[in-house]
Amino acid sequence: MKPLSSPLQQYWQTVVERLPEPLAEESLSAQAKSVLTFSDFLQDSIIAHPEWLTELESQPPQADEWQHYAAWLQEALSNVSDEAGLMRELRLFRRRIMVRIAWAQTLALVTEESILQQLSHLAETLIVAARDWLYDACCREWGTPCNAQGEAQPLLILGMGKLGGGELNFSSDIDLIFAWPEHGCTQGGRRELDNAQFFTRMGQRLIKVQDQPTQDGFVYRVDMRLRPFGESGPLVLSFAALEDYYQEQGRDWERYAMVKARIMGDSDGVYANELRAMLRPFVFRRYIDFSVIQSLRNMKGMIAREVRRRGLTDNIKLGAGGIREIEFIVQVFQLIRGGREPSLQSRSLLPTLSAIAALHLLSENDAEQLRVAYLFLRRLENLLQSINDEQTQTLPFDELNRARLAWAMDFADWPQLTGVLTAHMANVRRVFNELIGDDESETQEESLSEQWRELWQDALQEDDTTPVLAHLSEDDRKQVLMLIADFRKELDKRTIGPRGRQVLDHLMPHLLSDVCAREDAAVTLSRITALLVGIVTRTTYLELLSEFPAALKHLISLCAASPMIASQLARYPLLLDELLDPNTLYQPTATDAYRDELRQYLLRVPEDDEEQQLEALRQFKQAQLLRIAAADIAGTLPVMKVSDHLTWLAEAMIDAVVQQAWVQMVARYGKPNHLNEREGRGFAVVGYGKLGGWELGYSSDLDLIFLHDCPMDAMTDGEREIDGRQFYLRLAQRIMHLFSTRTSSGILYEVDARLRPSGAAGMLVTSAEAFADYQKNEAWTWEHQALVRARVVYGDPQLTAHFDAVRREIMTLPREGKTLQTEVREMREKMRAHLGNKHRDRFDIKADEGGITDIEFITQYLVLRYAHEKPKLTRWSDNVRILELLAQNDIMEEQEAMALTRAYTTLRDELHHLALQELPGHVSEDCFTAERELVRASWQKWLVEE
C-alpha cells in the first residue's frame, strides 16, 4: 500500500485528536490510518460504531460479498415490528455496508467494476427489502390487491439510470418507476381499495421509508420524475397505462432513459417478463434509427448549456469529455442499432462498449480509450463522493481534498492527476465530436437562439439566471420561469404526440423571444400559456403559429393588450385563423355588410343541420368580435364606432336567428294564414337598452321584446295546424332557445325579455294592439323611459311603422313637469340603492352618481318632458344624438349638450377598455372627477331644482 503523502500525514494528526479511546492510534493498522485520513465519512462512521472497524480488520471486504447483502439485511430486519424500526434498520445497514465499500475502494482491494456492482446491489437490496416488508404490512391493513381472476398483484419497481445499469455511484439519488400488472381490488382487508389506491399509498410509504431524514440519516434520495407525465403523473401505473403512454407519447429522452431500466428483485417472474416484453419495442426499434443522433445531440446541448449556466467547471460527469459523454456515445449505438443487434441491448456500459467494438462500430483503439477513461472517471467520482458521502462531481478546490484524491488515485500530486484526467477527457471528447457533433462553433445569432431554446427546454429554476431575461425585474424573471415550468408540467398531462412536441419545441423559443422582449413579459406570457394549454393537443394550431411568424406577433400583441381577447382565443382556438390576415384582422366588417357576410358564412352549412347552424352563428360572432376588439386596441375605431359595429353585428345575428326559427316553425306548423293576404311575417323584434340605443359593449346582454299582428281567429296552414298566436309564442320561445343554447362555442347572447308588458309575468310575445294599449294605460313612467331607447331591430315594414307610431305617441304625451321629475328621480334613487357601488373608495362608471346611468336618465327625462312640444326629440334612440336634438331644439344649451356628450363617450370608452382587460366597471375614486362634477351639475339642474 502506498504511504500517505506529506499533506495527508500532517492531517492525520488532526484525525488522531478526534479518535475515541477504543481507537487509539497505536492500535490502528496502516490501512485503517490511511482510510480514516482519506474519508471524513469513514471517520464519522467508525467513531460512531468502533465495532465496524474490528469487523473490517477481521473480515476484509470481498469482491463477491454483494451476494450476501440480502441475507444479511433479512437477518437485520427479522425483529422489526413497525415502520420506524424498518427505517432505522435500513439506514444502519446502508451505512455499515457503505463503510465496507468505501474501505475496499480507498485501498483498491477490488476493481472499480466490482465497486459499481456492490453499490448497485446494495441499493437494490434495500429497495426490495423495504418493498416486501411494506407490501406485507399494507396487505394486512387493506387486503391483498388482486386482478379480476383473484390473483395477487405485486408492485414491480424499475430501477432507472445507473441503478438499472448496475453502475451506481457512491452518493447518488435513485431513479425509480413503480408499476402493477392489472386493475382490480383488494381482498381480505377491513376495507376494499382498488389496486391504484393500494399501490399509490404503498408507493408513498416506500418513498418515505427511503428518503425521509431521521437521526440515522436517510437511505437514498428517491427521484420519481422519470415516470410517465413526470411529477404531474400518477405515482404508480398499471401495465396497460404504461404501454399506452410509451406507444402514444414516449419521447426520445424517455427511450434513452429506458435503455438502462431494470426490474428490481426477482426479475424472472411472469409479470416481470411481461413488463420487459412490453417495453422492449419502445426502446429498441426493429429498424435502424438514425433520428436518435439529433435527439442525443439536443440532449447534450441542453446539458452543455446547464454546465455553462450553473458554472459547472471541473465537472467530471457533465463537462466536456466527462462521464455523460461516454454514456451518450454508447447509447447512440444502442438506440440506433439495438433493435437488430441483441448484443447491444445490455443495460451496463462496459459490456455494451465491448459489443460495439466487436461489431466494428468503433475502432478497437477508440473503444479501449473510452473503457479506460470511463473506469478512471468512475473511480475518481466515487472517491470524491466517499470523502463526505456527498453527491458531487466537481473537483475540489481545497488542498486537503486534492491531496486525498491524488493519493487514492495513486498519483504523486494534484497536477499529475489532472494531467492524466485531461488526457482521458480529451480522448472522450474527440470520439464524441466525431460521432455526435461539436456544439462549440456557433455564431452570435445561433448563440442567442440557443439561449431561447435553453429557456424553453432546460426547465430552469426560479433562482437560475439567464442573460435573455436580464432586463426584467427579479420578480418578473421569477414569474416567467415559473410560468414556463408550470406550462411544461401541464404538457406532461396531455396526449401531444411526437409531432406536436416537435412543433412546440420549434415554436416556443420564437414565442419566448418575442414575449420576453416586452416589459410586461410575465403578464403576457401568463395569458398566452393559458391559451396554448388549450391547443397543444391540436397540432394544426401550433403549426399555424409556428409557420406564420406574423400570426404569432399578432397573437402576442393582442394578448398583451387584452386578457379578454386572450380568453376568447383560449376558449375558441378556431379564432386563431383570423390572425393570418392583418388586413381583415384590424379592419372590421363595414357596418352595413354584417348581414350579407353572415348570410354568405351560413351558406357553407346545411340549412337543415341545426347544430352546425348554431355553431356557425357563434363562430361568426366570435370572429367579428375579435376583429372589432383588434381595431379598438389598435386605435382605428373610436368608442362610438365600436358600439356601432357591436350593434350591427347583434342585429345581423337577430336576423339570422329569427330566420332559422321561422323556417323550423313553418316546417312544423305551416304559416299563420293571415299572412296569405300580405307581405312579411307579421313579427317584429324590438331592441331596448344598449341595443336600442346603439351602445352595445363587448359583453352586453340583449334586451328584447317580441311583437306580432296576428288576428285572434288566425290558424296556421300546415298539417299540424295550431292557433296563429300560439305559433308566434312558439316562434319567440324558439328564438330564445337558439340564442341561449350552449354549444362548444358557447352561447350566442344572453337575452333579457323582461321589459315586455307586465314583465316576466307577461306573455313572451305581445300583439301590437296589446302593446299599444299597455303603454297608454298601464305602463309606469320607467317603462316610458325605456321606450326612449327602443327601436325595431327586426320586423316587416308594417309592424315597424306601427311600433314607431306607438312610441312617438307615448313619448309625446303631455306630462306634468314636477311629477315627471319626481318619478324619474325616485326611480334613479331606487336603482342606486339596489345597484350602486359596493366598493369603498371606487367609482362605478355606470351605476354611481355622476356616471353613465345619470346621463341616460337626464336625456330620457328631457325627451319625455318636452317631446309634446318638440316631437322631433323622438327621432333617435341613442343618447348622443338625443343630446344633439336637445341642443338643436333649444331645450339644452349647446355647450352643456356637448360637455355631456364628451363625458358620456369618455366614460363609455373606459368601460370598453376595462372589458378588454376583463376588469369590472369601477375605477379609483379620484378618476373622472371633472366628468362626474359636470354630470352632477346637470342632474341638479334638470332633476332636482324646480
From Swiss-Prot:
Residues 1-440 are annotated as: Adenylyl removase. Residues 449-946 are annotated as: Adenylyl transferase. Its cofactor is Mg(2+). It is an enzyme of class 2 (transferase). Keywords: ATP-binding, Magnesium, Multifunctional enzyme, Nucleotide-binding, Nucleotidyltransferase, Transferase. It comes from the Bacteria. Gene3D superfamilies: 1.20.120.1510, Beta Polymerase, domain 2, Glutamine synthase adenylyltransferase GlnE, Nucleotidyltransferases domain 2. It catalyses: [glutamine synthetase]-O(4)-(5'-adenylyl)-L-tyrosine + phosphate = [glutamine synthetase]-L-tyrosine + ADP; [glutamine synthetase]-L-tyrosine + ATP = [glutamine synthetase]-O(4)-(5'-adenylyl)-L-tyrosine + diphosphate. GO terms for cellular component: cytosol. Its EC number is 2.7.7.89, 2.7.7.42. GO terms for molecular function: [glutamate-ammonia-ligase] adenylyltransferase activity; [glutamine synthetase]-adenylyl-L-tyrosine phosphorylase activity; ATP binding; magnesium ion binding. Signal peptide: none annotated. GO terms for biological process: regulation of glutamine family amino acid metabolic process. InterPro entries: GlnE (IPR023057), GlnE_rpt_dom (IPR005190), NT_sf (IPR043519), PII_UdlTrfase/GS_AdlTrfase (IPR013546). Belongs to the GlnE family. Involved in the regulation of glutamine synthetase GlnA, a key enzyme in the process to assimilate ammonia. When cellular nitrogen levels are high, the C-terminal adenylyl transferase (AT) inactivates GlnA by covalent transfer of an adenylyl group from ATP to specific tyrosine residue of GlnA, thus reducing its activity. Conversely, when nitrogen levels are low, the N-terminal adenylyl removase (AR) activates GlnA by removing the adenylyl group by phosphorolysis, increasing its activity. This is Bifunctional glutamine synthetase adenylyltransferase/adenylyl-removing enzyme.
